């Protein structure tokens, strides 16, 4: 891998967006998935703060932080879909999440890849509780972290968004379709 290129690209985009306060944590080794990458990236922070995570292979158009973020321990955005290549939500009452699965369709509520945790300390504690049986296809994914939080009494919610607010670009075909769209 060529290290340094990604941070320069990110700095350029941050400047373009006018973001004044930020940190870039560059990982120099492969990880066992997105959840481990996030865990490693947060290790040196001693103050607690909320975190938003978004999959790099998805574009979320016109995102605005929802008010629900101040009223729950975590949330994930979903769209109505099908297939087995998503994270899924088993819904409860009032948009609560009973459990999540990875690549295992338990409903038609598919995560678009946007995840919120009110406390990065909660996320880290839940990640530390994972073991090899929590790996899916050799990776630790973000969505299943919510199951630990839910078992510990956390209030995790989902928000439904329109498929029109999302563009996918994780496969070659999705990328080609995205290029044609723009």
Positions of PLM-derived features:
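Conserved beta-strand scaffold positions in the cores of enzyme catalytic domains, especially
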Residues: 24, 74-75, 158, 166
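Conserved beta-strand segments of alpha/beta enzyme cores
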Residues: 21-23, 96, 155-157
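Conserved N-terminal catalytic core of the sugar/cofactor nucleotidyltransferase
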Residues: 1-50
């Amino acid at each position: 891998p060529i290290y340094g290129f990604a941070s320069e690209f990110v700095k350029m985009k941050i400047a373009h967006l006018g973001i004044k306060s930020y940190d870039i944590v560059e990982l120099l080794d492969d990880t066992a998935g997105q959840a481990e990458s996030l865990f490693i990236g947060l290790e040196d922070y001693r103050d607690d703060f909320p975190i938003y995570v978004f999959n790099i292979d998805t574009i979320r158009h016109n995102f605005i932080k929802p008010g629900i973020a101040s009223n729950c321990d975590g949330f994930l955005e979903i769209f109505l879909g099908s297939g087995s290549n998503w994270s899924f939500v088993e819904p409860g009452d009032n948009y609560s999440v009973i459990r999540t699965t990875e690549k295992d369709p338990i409903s038609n509520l598919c995560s678009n890849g946007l995840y919120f945790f009110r406390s990065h300390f909660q996320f880290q504690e839940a990640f530390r509780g994972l073991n090899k049986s929590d790996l899916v296809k050799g990776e630790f994914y973000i969505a299943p972290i919510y199951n630990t939080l839910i078992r510990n009494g956390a209030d995790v919610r989902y928000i439904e968004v329109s498929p029109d607010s999302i563009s996918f670009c994780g496969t070659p075909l999705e990328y080609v379709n995205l290029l044609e769209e723009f």
